[in-house]
């Protein structure tokens, strides 16, 4: 892994708590991570936030932008707002002034801006949003993609998702031989709809993908898989359900544990354990999701992100930069394209 001083273009105006929480997260990241940060947005609003929080001796640069794509607006608005913060941030990456974009704003707008400004990697038909899920194995995560970028998919899209997930698992998560699974309603190869059946065949025949078979819903958090692929419709439902389960679990613990003096004593004794539980199940700990398949690093954070989540999103972006995820995916998909061309020539 080549560790570099990463330059992050941070959409300071994106999110429910922008710019305050975004700026606080940026300050912490600048202090604790080896990064330089461009705060993109309304200069006066950003400066007001900086004045309220100590930030001496750290490298934060404000880049002017005009306006923001609001959550209720359609993603295509990015075309009509070229000076919006998300577009300006993407341009910094396009012009090689920054290495990655991080945004907690409109996720559809972030994806649209990435496609417009950065473009797709060769061999990628559709970008995918990939996010890390905790598993029952301590310290192990599983990357699931797509979790919302493409509600309708072709088998070849899922094959590309599997390649991108494999690269991430190998070079960022450090898994030598990742186990790739296809999310389905059963383990058997003859289970599922047309998309699942055709995708299973593609994944099984691709030597670049360490495919081990179908993964059922219960397998997502089991730790038996390192990469799980699905279409964005199913993936987004899985993501939102998992987030809700995590929130409910934490809520139940907070509600039940302090009851009575024994509970209060137990809460004090178990405080370190409870903190670790929160770190494993709280989606804010991962910071966001990577947009795979675009020509650059892009992290999309939850709209409700607070400063801690923004910090983690910046860390996620830096890991992708240090491990050259985009470059490695490009190499992997180039091999896929060459194999497909060879097969086409053989079939003539």
UniProtKB/Swiss-Prot annotation:
GO terms for biological process: fatty acid biosynthetic process; phospholipid biosynthetic process. GO terms for molecular function: phosphate:acyl-[acyl carrier protein] acyltransferase activity. It is found in: Cytoplasm. InterPro entries: FA_synthesis (IPR003664), Phospholipid_synth_PlsX-like (IPR012281). Catalyzes the reversible formation of acyl-phosphate (acyl-PO(4)) from acyl-[acyl-carrier-protein] (acyl-ACP). This enzyme utilizes acyl-ACP as fatty acyl donor, but not acyl-CoA. Homodimer. Probably interacts with PlsY. HAMAP family: PlsX. This is Phosphate acyltransferase. The lineage of its organism: Bacteria, Bacillati, Cyanobacteriota, Cyanophyceae, Synechococcales.
